[in-house]
């Protein structure tokens, strides 16, 4: 009933409002077009067009069919290529989770453009998670690949890892903060007087990692790195920032870096993917990272020197 030729004919008549104009568009005779529409109406059991001597217009049923017909025709026309892609080992859907520390909208867009050009029938889903929330997505939510899991060892032997680099940290505050010019190292008693600005771990199943905060110290939780940086600049509170993200603000004296009793060690991050069952799209993403291709360079800017 709804074969490609019938759908093309119906859409052409609906869009031109004329059997003769539809015939011209499809290089068919008017009689052929009229017969196909008549047969379609007989098979569906409803009138799809109001006919006058000058034009044809859609009935309510015809309007409904037109909304569906375009999608059906597009699906039918793309199906051979989709089936070939599946036969070639290409995934129907790839879910990618990215660590908040590495998340870069321009880098994400560049990667998606590269992938979409090569795998036009694959659905890509991007998620942004924090700390152990990245591993959580891989282990419990069916994600295919993670850009920036914490550590250099897999939490399960079903995953492969490629170390990307280590994030270096600086303890910062606004340049006009009361502690900005106090003798170093700052004491816990001095630090405890001011709020710690943190981003909460997004893990749902795994144990959340606790960010820097002293016992009894007020904590302000913000949703992302952009807000955390803005809060430090506004003098709202104190805390650690990745060196590469705050260096320009340290250089122009918007922020100052101070030494505290317990400095945060570097945080190693890795690419992680499933050892078994990965398709060609995931394999290509892994290759981009292991070969440090330009297409993924935006994700590695935070490290300064990748693999460090």
Swiss-Prot record:
Keyword annotations from UniProtKB, A to Z: Activator, DNA-binding, Transcription, Transcription regulation
GO molecular function: DNA binding; DNA-binding transcription factor activity
Residues annotated as domain HTH lysR-type: 2-59
UniProt-listed InterPro entries: LTTR, LysR_subst-bd, Tscrpt_reg_HTH_LysR, WH-like_DNA-bd_sf, WH_DNA-bd_sf
SUPFAM superfamilies with a match to the protein in the record: Periplasmic binding protein-like II, Winged helix' DNA-binding domain
Pfam family, one: HTH_1
Bilayer-crossing regions: none
Regions recorded as binding DNA: 19-38
General function of this protein: Positive regulator essential for the expression of allD operon. Binds to the allD promoter.
Family according to the record: Belongs to the LysR transcriptional regulatory family.
Protein name (database record): HTH-type transcriptional activator AllS
Lineage: Bacteria, Pseudomonadati, Pseudomonadota, Gammaproteobacteria, Enterobacterales
């Amino acid at each position: 009933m709804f074969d490609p030729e019938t759908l093309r004919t119906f859409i052409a008549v609906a869009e031109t409002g004329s059997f003769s104009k539809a015939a011209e568009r499809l290089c068919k005779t008017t009689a052929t077009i009229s017969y196909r529409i008549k047969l379609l109406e007989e098979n569906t059991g409803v009138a799809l067009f109001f006919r006058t001597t000058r034009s044809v217009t859609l009935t309510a049923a015809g309007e409904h069919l037109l909304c569906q017909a375009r999608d059906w025709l597009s699906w039918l026309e793309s199906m051979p290529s989709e089936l070939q892609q599946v036969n070639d080992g290409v995934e129907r859907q790839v879910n990618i989770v990215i660590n908040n520390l590495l998340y870069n909208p321009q880098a994400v867009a560049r990667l998606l453009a590269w992938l979409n050009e090569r795998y036009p029938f694959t659905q890509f889903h991007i998620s942004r998670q924090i700390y152990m929330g990245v591993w959580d997505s891989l282990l419990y939510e069916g994600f295919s690949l993670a850009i920036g899991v914490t550590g250099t060892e897999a939490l399960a032997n079903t995953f492969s890892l490629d170390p990307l680099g280590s994030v270096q940290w600086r303890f910062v505050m606004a340049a006009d903060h009361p502690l900005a010019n106090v003798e170093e190292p700052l004491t816990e008693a001095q630090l405890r007087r001011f709020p710690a600005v943190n981003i909460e771990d997004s893990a749902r199943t795994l144990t959340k990692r606790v960010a820097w905060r002293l016992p009894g110290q007020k904590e302000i939780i913000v949703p992302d790195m952009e807000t955390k940086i803005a809060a430090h600049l506004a003098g709202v509170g104190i805390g650690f920032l990745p060196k590469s993200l705050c260096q320009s603000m340290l250089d122009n004296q918007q922020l100052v870096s101070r030494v505290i009793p317990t400095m945060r060690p570097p945080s190693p991050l890795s690419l992680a993917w499933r050892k078994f069952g990965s398709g060609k799209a995931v394999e290509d993403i892994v290759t981009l990272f292991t070969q440090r291709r330009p297409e993924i360079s935006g994700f590695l800017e935070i490290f300064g020197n990748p693999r460090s």
